[in-house]
Amino acid sequence: QTREDLEAVASKDQKMGARSRYAHVDMSITQEGIHDSPDSVVNNPVAADPLHFYDMCPVSDGAAAVILCPAEKAKAVSQNVPVVIAGFGQATDTHTLQEREDPTDLKAVTLASEQAFGMAGLTPQDVDVAELHDAFTVLEIAESEHAGFFKKGEGGPAAVKGETSLGGKLPINVSGGLKA
């Protein structure tokens, strides 16, 4: 991924998160503001090259809940239309990056995605919106590729072109993700 790819993801996620009153970081930044601002070195310092401040999620607490129950029970206790889980997947890989052939190769994401799509009878092209784990901008890009939404090397350029923004080909992390 290029610096431009990472900045596109960071600014997109901050913009999406700024729309939510529940966001950890409720502000919008632009890609130009990250890169071209005279204060960019101060406001977006290098943390671990090539990652900068806006490439990482803040250390904070949050919560989400999902209630799993039979559809009939859900209809009886909620006015909302129940969501049916069509497929799921689970996989693990070595956590130690130096033990991987390629540190950006996310085999567990590939395997879990293949399981979920197979169970659901769908393909990545059938997905309209995706929420991916994005503690770092590079993860959103790598996961979008390993889940099959983009070919390897095309996730970052897709973000730069706006394909992962609202109104794009595949909006990713419309909540703002972990970074917002």
Predicted region positions:
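Glycine-rich, mobile lid/loop segments that gate access to catalytic sites or pores
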Residues: 1-46, 50
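Phosphate/pyrophosphate-binding loops at sites that engage ATP/ADP/AMP, CoA/4′-phosphopantetheine
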Residues: 2, 75, 112-126
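Condensing-enzyme catalytic core mediating Claisen C-C bond formation in acyl metabolism
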Residues: 8-9, 45-115, 161-175, 179
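Acyl-CoA/ACP chain-elongation machinery
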Residues: 10-24, 93-97, 136-142
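Stable alpha-helical structural segments in soluble proteins, enriched in small hydrophobic residues
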Residues: 65, 108, 112-120, 139-147
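Short, conserved beta-strand edge motifs with alternating hydrophobic and charged residues
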Residues: 85-86, 128-133
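Short glycine/threonine-rich loop-to-helix capping motif typified by GTGT followed
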Residues: 95-102, 134-157, 168
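Hydrophobic alpha-helical bundle architecture
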Residues: 120-130, 154, 173-180
